[in-house]
Regions:
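Conserved N-terminal subdomain of the carbohydrate kinase-like
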Residues: 2-122, 126-129
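Intrinsic structural disorder
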Residues: 1-2, 14, 37, 158-162, ...
């Protein structure tokens, strides 16, 4: 087992700074990401952006958005321990406020300044086809204009890909070629890799998802 602060690491281990939500009920954000990544051998350092009872797609929830200043303090404390220079990947998900988004981007800059080979993977959480948009209305344009252009990898679902690019708006089940065109449009925004999740397209049976 590799311990925080020790110089050695296991073969293939990636050290991940995961800045995401945490929920008590269900599995999203850090509540979904941390254990699986640890289980396959990676070192994950979670920083929570919200502490919610459940994810906001339910329409009602309780618990606080962590103040952006507090998220920043946690990251600065890690920087003071020399941890940011060890980070290989910054992973971000649900961003509870525009202020937290700014803190995430600052963390990405700090990590890349300390480790020039580090990457940033952004899950641009905005909503889904069933629930529509369930984030602060200020978040989608911020993701589109500031966050996604600075990401190396993005992992939108089909709804989020359409929201980012303005494409895929006319059909709930577009052709696969249209989805690939939207992914190309997203790559043109900045990230080199676009991984689209929860795809439902016209070329597949209606009772399946990809």
């Amino acid at each position: 087992m590799v311990r925080l602060g020790r110089p050695g690491r296991q073969t293939g281990e990636v050290r991940i700074l995961s800045i995401q939500s945490s929920v008590a009920y269900g599995h999203v954000g850090n509540s979904a990401a941390v254990f699986p990544l640890q289980r396959i051998g990676h070192e994950v350092w979670p920083v929570h952006t919200v502490l919610f009872s459940n994810h906001t797609g339910y329409g009602a929830w309780r618990g606080p958005v962590v103040a952006a200043a507090d998220v920043r303090e946690v990251i600065l404390g890690m920087e003071e321990r020399g941890a940011l220079a060890q980070v290989d990947l910054v992973l971000s998900g649900y961003q509870g406020s525009p202020e937290i988004a700014a803190v995430v981007l600052d963390a990405v800059e700090r990590v890349k300044a300390a480790n020039g080979s580090a990457s940033y993977a952004c899950d641009p959480v905005m909503g889904n086809a069933d629930s529509g948009c369930f984030v602060d209305p200020a978040i989608p344009p911020l993701l589109r204009e500031q966050v996604v252009p600075r990401a190396d990898v993005i992992t939108p679902n089909q709804f989020e890909l359409g929201s980012l690019t303005g494409l895929l708006q006319d059909s709930a089940r577009p052709r696969i070629a249209e989805i690939l065109d939207a992914a190309d449009a997203a790559r043109a925004m900045g990230p080199s890799t676009v991984l689209v999740t929860s795809v439902a397209h016209a070329d597949q049976p209606e009772d399946t998802i990809e």
